[in-house]
Amino acid sequence: MGVVENRKILPEKKLGGWRAITFILGNETLEKLGSIGVSANFMLYLRNVFHMEPVEAFNVYYLWMGLTNFAPLLGALISDAYIGRFKTIAYASLFSILGLMTVTLTACLPQLHPPPCNNPHPDECDDPNKLQLGILFLGLGFLSIGSGGIRPCSIPFGVDQFDQRTEQGLKGVASFFNWYYLTLTMVLIFSHTVVVYLQTVSWVIGFSIPTSLMACAVVLFFVGMRFYVYVKPEGSVFSGIARVIVAARKKRDLKISLVDDGTEEYYEPPVKPGVLSKLPLTDQFKFLDKAAVILDGDLTSEGVPANKWRLCSIQEVEEVKCLIRVVPVWSAGIISIVAMTTQATFMVFQATKMDRHMGPHFEIPAASITVISYITIGIWVPIYEHLLVPFLWRMRKFRVTLLQRMGIGIVFAILSMFTAGFVEGVRRTRATEMTQMSVFWLALPLILMGLCESFNFIGLIEFFNSQFPEHMRSIANSLFPLSFAAANYLSSLLVTTVHKVSGTKDHPDWLNKDLDRGKLDYFYYLIAVLGVVNLVYFWYCAHRYQYKAGSQIEDFNEEKSLLDIEPNQRHDQSPS
């Protein structure tokens, strides 16, 4: 989508403003309560109800999560190019409610799950049959389709309700973001505490409540229809990227100078109305510049391209370069997500082996232990933004840049995995001595992982949004879930490989179904070592990164390291 000035709003419609946002935020909050409420404890559902081994349950869960995080890229394409954001959210919401109903039925109907088993080892119980697995996977597929439509469109659809040409509209957008992330944090905490607790009491109740909330979300979304602003689709930026690549390939035999000396004539029309960033021609990825070189027959008598798949503007070429430059930094964030998702998953199994009592009458649900990370984020982010950043600026005239924040987050991920390995080693030793370890020992790695998310993931989102032109923000907002998709698939591959190669006839594998016989701490150490290698790779990418021309954030060039940044080069950067 283009920026506001290019929006094609139906003339009889007024800007929705906060009347519309009330329905959009209500829908988004209830939808997330439904989807997260099911996924938060789903590993234990696969383990205890469908009797899957830990590795099998891990693979099913993360293959589903990978599909769920990849789907928003397709959802953004369909929304921008074909049906618009409202219809995308509407259709996706129906798929989400259908998916939740299907998963709930697998818990309600005895024909749709294996018979209950009181054996303390679920792997010795009856396996699910093909029909039961098929119904379960069908429900998960519906949920992935729903997430693919809702995630990439909910924030842009909310922004559409404000006129950003006015000061009031800009303030409304800023306030909308604050409310959006506040409600998301509340949903995460509620889902990992109240909903998870209800699921320990009854899976039927624990799944029925998220399903009911999702149904309320769908109703609320349609009730607000008369208040919404509807922006027509104007075509996807993906087609522009494809045109640049095709045009450059068609002119691959063209010889151009490495330095712009005026011998080539480039196509540089006036930028479209409302485009705030006019990108100059850069000296990176010169092979793409061929797409903008004007040859005989490329222009019509009116001065426009005769074939848009043969001639592109400098602006279009530079937009593709922005994407190419970001990819290495994007890839460096995947290992940290692998660490986070792997730790959160296996810690649920660890918690089942530990003392979870708070007082004589209450036992903490195993899946609720991960809420410590969210609490850490909620405490640390305000401290960082309102205390630490102003303090560093007053004392040293120093601000932590986005890439530095991401690097610090990677370090915290490494420390978290080393700490998790140490805690698991102590837990397993005590288990052999027939003594249980308090579950609150897991708070140490979870707090460190919460700090990783506060630095790395928030910095990554800001980085993506600062390094793309305005109308490419849909790509920027798709890259983050796409990194989770890549991490989910990599996690599944890593777990499967370690499970197969780490065991022998005389020694169980590291990820044995019985944690007391396995070596989960070794697996944590392996991911920590991968994190160290990834930190070196990230430093190299950050060291060589060239910021988008005109960007106010220029904290790296080929002669500056991760920590060697002069304050006067950051004076225009807002605290982050």
Curated annotation (Swiss-Prot):
Annotated TM spans: 58-78, 89-109, 130-150, 176-196, 203-223, 329-349, 364-384, 406-426, 441-461, 475-495, 522-542
Inducing factors: Up-regulated by nitrogen starvation.
Keywords: Cell membrane, Membrane, Nitrate assimilation, Symport, Transmembrane, Transmembrane helix, Transport
GO biological process, alphabetically ordered: cellular response to nitrogen levels; embryo development ending in seed dormancy; nitrate assimilation; nitrate transmembrane transport; oligopeptide transport; seed development; suspensor development
Stored Gene3D superfamilies: MFS general substrate transporter like domains
Superkingdom classification of source: Eukaryota
Membrane topology: Multi-pass membrane protein
Any Pfam family: PTR2
One GO cellular component term: plasma membrane
GO MF annotation: an example: low-affinity nitrate transmembrane transporter activity
Predominant subcellular localization, coarse grouping: membrane
Observed phenotype of the null mutant: Aberrant embryo development and increased seed abortion. Reduced seed nitrate content.
InterPro entries named in the record: MFS_trans_sf (IPR036259), POT_fam (IPR000109), PTR2_symporter_CS (IPR018456)
Location of this chain's protein in the cell: Cell membrane
Tissue distribution of the protein: Expressed in flowers and siliques. Expressed in vascular bundle of the siliques and in funiculus.
Known role: Low-affinity proton-dependent nitrate transporter. Not involved in dipeptides transport. Involved in delivering nitrate for seed development.
Entry's family note: Belongs to the major facilitator superfamily. Proton-dependent oligopeptide transporter (POT/PTR) (TC 2.A.17) family.
Protein name in the entry: Protein NRT1/ PTR FAMILY 2.12
